[in-house]
Amino acid sequence: MDKLTDLNYTLNVITLLNSTLHTILEDPGMAYFPYIASVLTVLFTLHKASIPTMKIALRTSKCSYKVIKYCIVTIFNTLLKLAGYKEQITTKDEIEKQMDRVVKEMRRHLEMIDKLTTREIEQVELLKRIYDKLMARATDEIDMTKEINQKNVKTLEEWENGKNPYESKRMTAAM
């Protein structure tokens, strides 16, 4: 008889829970119930996961303040992502790392600019030397007759009897 009573009691508890859930879900004010349940699940998971992790980290780490700060920042960043924000909380260490990276990149760019400037200066000096060599000789001193093959060409005054030897003559042929 006790077993039947326990069974009836269990069935009554189950029906009571079911009816309570149905009335909660039918209420228009509880339209956000799945979202609230999701947030509570995430918070519970973070709570269960972060406490053992922090205990281990605090035992093994020498600097417990940094570990706690890092864990809290990570939890807040997770909550911000869940809320839909794109911004994140950063620590001073992360900002310093980013600044070091930016400074290193700027130094690399400055070295590149210095190398390019040095090369450009060398090229300008080379062009100046080439220009000076080209301008060293005047064009009057250069004998262009060798270049255009006119050494043996005679002018009109140099021809014998003033006649052009290349002019064609009229000839008649005997048949």
From Swiss-Prot:
One BP term from GO: monoatomic ion transmembrane transport
The record's keywords, sorted A to Z, are: Activation of host autophagy by virus, Calcium, Enterotoxin, Glycoprotein, Host endoplasmic reticulum, Host membrane, Host-virus interaction, Ion channel, Ion transport, Membrane, Metal-binding, Secreted, Signal-anchor, Toxin, Transmembrane, Transmembrane helix, Transport, Viral ion channel, Virulence
Post-translational note: The N-glycosyl content is primarily Man(9)GlcNAc, with a small amount of Man(8)GlcNAc.
GO molecular function terms noted in the UniProt entry = channel activity; metal ion binding; toxin activity
Superkingdom of this protein's organism = Viruses
Carbohydrate attachment residues: 8, 18
Q: Name one Pfam family in it.
A: Rota_NSP4
Residues on Lumenal side:
1-28
Q: Where in the cell is it found?
A: Host rough endoplasmic reticulum membrane; Host membrane, Host caveola; Secreted
TM segment ranges:
29-51
Q: Which GO terms describe its cellular component?
A: extracellular region; host caveola; host cell rough endoplasmic reticulum membrane; membrane
Q: What InterPro entries does the record tag this protein with?
A: Rotavirus_NSP4
Domain comment from the record reads as follows: Binds 1 calcium ion per tetramer.
Function recorded in the entry: Plays an essential role in the virus replication cycle by acting as a viroporin. Creates a pore in the host endoplasmic reticulum and as a consequence releases Ca(2+) in the cytoplasm of infected cell. In turn, high levels of cytoplasmic calcium trigger membrane trafficking and transport of viral ER-associated proteins to viroplasms, sites of viral genome replication and immature particle assembly.
The record's comment on protein family reads: Belongs to the rotavirus NSP4 family.
On assembly, the entry states:
Homotetramer. Interacts with the immature particle in the viroplasm. Interacts with host CAV1, early and late in infection. Interacts with host integrin ITGA1/ITGB1 heterodimer. Interacts with host integrin ITGA2/ITGB1 heterodimer. Interaction with microtubules blocks trafficking to the Golgi apparatus.
Supply the name of the protein.
Non-structural glycoprotein 4
